[in-house]
Curated annotation (Swiss-Prot):
Part of the 50S ribosomal subunit. Contacts protein L20. Pfam families: Ribosomal_L21p. It comes from the Bacteria. This is Large ribosomal subunit protein bL21. The keyword Ribonucleoprotein applies. This protein binds to 23S rRNA in the presence of protein L20. GO terms for cellular component: cytoplasm; ribonucleoprotein complex; ribosome. The lineage of its organism: Bacteria, Bacillati, Mycoplasmatota, Mollicutes, Mycoplasmataceae.
Amino acid sequence: MFAIIRTGGKQIKVEQGQEIFIEKIKGEVNDKIAFDEILMIDGKIGTPTIKGAKVLGTIIKQGKAKKIRVIRYHPKKNVNKIYGHRQPYTKVKIDEISAK
C-alpha cells in the first residue's frame, strides 16, 4: 500500500516502513506525527485530499543537510562574498497508512 502526502510544500510518495526526509517540523525524536493531507492512496485520488485518511509516522532524527556555498561576485569591483547555508530537515519513519 502506498500514499502520496503533501508536507513542506512538496508531494512525497510513501510506503509503510519507509524512512523519508522532509522539511523541518516541530517535535522531538520518537514523537508520533500524523499527516492529514493525503492526496492519493493506492490509486484512489482525492479532490484535492482524501477525507478521513491518515499517515502516521515517528520522528527518527532532526538534523541539517550538507552545507552549500553561495558566492556573490562582481567582476572588476573587488567584491567577493561567500555565504553558507545548511537546510534543516526531519527524518521520519512511516508506521501506518490508513484510509477510511
